[in-house]
From Swiss-Prot:
Disulfide bonds: none annotated. Keywords: Acyltransferase, Flavonoid biosynthesis, Transferase. Belongs to the thiolase-like superfamily. Chalcone/stilbene synthases family. One of its GO terms (biological process) is polyketide biosynthetic process. This is Chalcone synthase A. The primary product of this enzyme is 4,2',4',6'-tetrahydroxychalcone (also termed naringenin-chalcone or chalcone) which can under specific conditions spontaneously isomerize into naringenin. It catalyses: (E)-4-coumaroyl-CoA + 3 malonyl-CoA + 3 H(+) = 2',4,4',6'-tetrahydroxychalcone + 3 CO2 + 4 CoA. Pfam families: Chal_sti_synt_C, Chal_sti_synt_N. It comes from Ipomoea nil (Japanese morning glory). One of its GO terms (molecular function) is naringenin-chalcone synthase activity. Transmembrane segments: none annotated. Pathway: Secondary metabolite biosynthesis; flavonoid biosynthesis.
Amino acid sequence: MSTILTNTWTRREKRIEGHAKILAIGTAIPANWVDQTTYPDFYFRITNSEHLLEHKEKFRRICNKSKIRKRHLVITEELLKKNPNLCTYNEASLNTRQDILVSEVPKLGKEAAMKAIKEWGRPISEITHLVFCTSSGVDMPGADFQLAKLLGLSSSVNRLMMYQQGCNAGAAMLRLAKDLAENNKGGRVLVVCSEVMLNVFRGPSLEQEDYLLAQCLFGDGSAAVIVGTEPRPGLETPLFELVSAAQTTIPDTDSHLKLHLREMGLTFHCSKAVPSLITQNVEDYLVKAFEPFGISDWNSIFWILHPGGIAILDRVEEKLGLEPEKLRASRDVLSESGNLTSAC
């Protein structure tokens, strides 16, 4: 049940001054992991596709060029053998996937949330808002409700569930948390992004070769932050200040990157033009974002670029003339975990 009360005077009284700040960060990954160099052998064996020799060699080349060393996955050989419908390309398997995801996504989210809460050092009862995001499965009550139960949050915590936001979701959740914190005096917002990319795992397709990229790129993981304003001296330690947050969309590009929920799971299509589309537009958008602050030297700022893939990182670095260390954090995440969608 949600209750909305409108009082303009009270609203003005409670609006606080100052920017929202990140007060704690937590991350988590599954214990199970796969070596990228041997993953093509595992993938084609477990999907009964070893006869597709040309496809396998193409996949091996994609993996070798990915600059990913390993990925952590909820998927195990045992799980796939128990559920062979996950290993074909287009067999109806949504029920199987959903049954696994509705449990695993909140559980992985809890691990990151508990680490953030521990770092924060305050009682969990002081959490006023919970924002949960995932592109892995859809359910009601949602993963936010399940996580609130796992954490033992108060039943009066204000919850918001965001499904199917994809790779832009991590930054979008920070933008949302900033708005919530800056409009709720004393509020402490727990943001959790948890991704288990079981929904995109399936066997190879001779007709849909770009799907091999999804099998090479995505990993499982979760991230959590606690956001609030006016940190209490001696009780809370601000890590980062959220000065400004904005979103933009490159026009006429919706056909280049698409994921659709179907009976076979979450389908994936990514055109080869995506890295070029990003690099052709990134500087114009950076100018608009940083001009109000008098910043035009891209090497003078701290970078956390979503590790969407090595081609994106390389081309953005080249386009903006960034020094190698500027994207080191993004490259490290890509190497050690892969693309974690909203969680990185």
